[in-house]
């Protein structure tokens, strides 16, 4: 008897850390749709980006390879994908109709990496071979050259509300395009839908409707630990955030939350399209991010660090096909590289031999996870074990250890504490 081939809706967001979701304990942010996905599926509460930088993280996701194997731990925007079977190719070879909407962040920009249909939206990066499909749509609908009319940058934390029509907002546009893809799928084949939003990554330009949800609300102050000193590496990591006033920091956090809530509401529309088409009950839903966002905690912004805000990401598998594990929270150490083999296992597709990640439905758990970012004076390495995390900066030989179980916000560095000497030695061996 032929095994069931489920449809997949894979929702990828950009720069959305595990900390910024309501169901993980953040009562200041509204994410009702994602909360429901978590209730209806399994959540991996210790999932990490092994290289929390846009391109390397997405290469790991799409190949199941760790950065050392796929070749990028920096941000190599002219590096081609490795010659291995990608996640999309594996589904295509198994007879799926593979469709992508949004950000792929590959080179060359129009490389389909195994998707049969691609509607591209790449944050206005013309240097990679634009225009993309979103920019073409803007030109055809009276918005030519207005993508950045708001004046906010892709890596800055000033904010203003979206100045164009709601239908032209990148989040709303991507949702509409995915709904169209769902309706035009091949009805004779199972479908792999990949929806890759470019937000909440800056620019911070929420729709007024969502900005107004947070503008008058109290919100968390930036958090600082007992370890931010005058070390060279900390000065480097904190450089980008030091130009913002306290008022600008709070506004940035509210705008970021607004962009998250906008995405959450749009996801509901995509799920609604699956239901209208009569395929929701046969569809596995996946939600994750490439990496997180420091958002002024520890005096930092962006990613490229192994602190929880940046490296700890959400991962949910949901939907009726996995109803047997509904509401489960799995605390094993997981990573982006595990998503490909897990999804292929769920859909009864053979996992390529090249994949280094492991299926999260196996009983065996890894003892530790290794992560690496960058080279030169900003090089950073990480070891994550059951309770503890070690962060190592080779330049300056700086070591930090955090008890993630007791100190999730990493306020207390334990690396110089005598009672953690054995923990430190064990983790350094792993490094």
How would you name each of these model-derived features?
Residues 1-393, 398-399, 408-429:
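Formylglycine-dependent sulfatase
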Residues 405:
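Residues forming the ATP-binding cleft of Hanks-type serine/threonine protein kinase domains
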